Amino acid sequence: MIVIFLGPPGAGKGTQGKKIAKKINVPHIAIGDIFRTIIKTSTSEAELINNYVRQGELIPNEIVNQVIKNFLLSSEYKNGYILDGYPRNLEQAQFFESFITEKIKIIYFDILDELLIKRVLGRYSCKNCGKIYNSYFLQPKTDSVCDVCGSSTFDYRKDDTEEVIKKRIKVYKTETYPLIDYYKNSGHFYIVNGSKNEQEIEIDIQKILKIN
């Protein structure tokens, strides 16, 4: 099974991607995580990518396409996967279809801009296990202690400022809305209400994918 999660940054794709991937026993591939890993390396490619991220701009198609193709052609992904954050535009979708022959399902996370900004501004994660929290909506049960692993070290994304987020949303809409129209005619396009809480969204996705 190949499932694509579409939606603006902070819509909940990563959280749901990890959960659903575990349920159906396939890898979760998050393009944002891949590029954040690259940025931590001391390479010219990392510096180039980091410049786009800091300015709230989308990374050029040719860079994104090559990175994601290298991942997906690995034997690790031959039995399917959940793809989070790719493709983002028509050019990327057409590139994806040029080397992927399996049927796919596309799930779009529809969410209000105001809620999206709060979700992104408040987002942080445990450095040890990666559990995601939010200073507005989801704090650890014990202050500064991860619910999952007990670590007290957390990671706050420095690129998540309100100005950058608003620019990212604007760029996303310009780039991705034509892609949504394209996929709507595929017969395999579904919309979930990203403004619902985490558990409700998970249930909606499970119904779409016909899993328990």
Curated annotation (Swiss-Prot):
Residues 30-59 are annotated as: NMP. InterPro entries: Adenyl_kin_sub, Adenylat/UMP-CMP_kin, Adenylat_kinase_CS, Adenylate_kinase_lid-dom, P-loop_NTPase. Its EC number is 2.7.4.3. It is an enzyme of class 2 (transferase). GO terms for molecular function: adenylate kinase activity; ATP binding; zinc ion binding. Pathway: Purine metabolism; AMP biosynthesis via salvage pathway; AMP from ADP: step 1/1. The keyword Kinase applies. This is Adenylate kinase. ATP binds at residues 10-15, 123, 132-133, 196. Consists of three domains, a large central CORE domain and two small peripheral domains, NMPbind and LID, which undergo movements during catalysis. The LID domain closes over the site of phosphoryl transfer upon ATP binding. Assembling and dissambling the active center during each catalytic cycle provides an effective means to prevent ATP hydrolysis. Some bacteria have evolved a zinc-coordinating structure that stabilizes the LID domain. It holds the Pfam family ADK. It comes from the Bacteria. The keyword Oxidoreductase does not apply. HAMAP family: Adenylate_kinase_Adk. Zn(2+) binds at residues 126, 129, 146, 149. Residues 122-160 are annotated as: LID. One of its GO terms (biological process) is AMP salvage. It catalyses: AMP + ATP = 2 ADP.
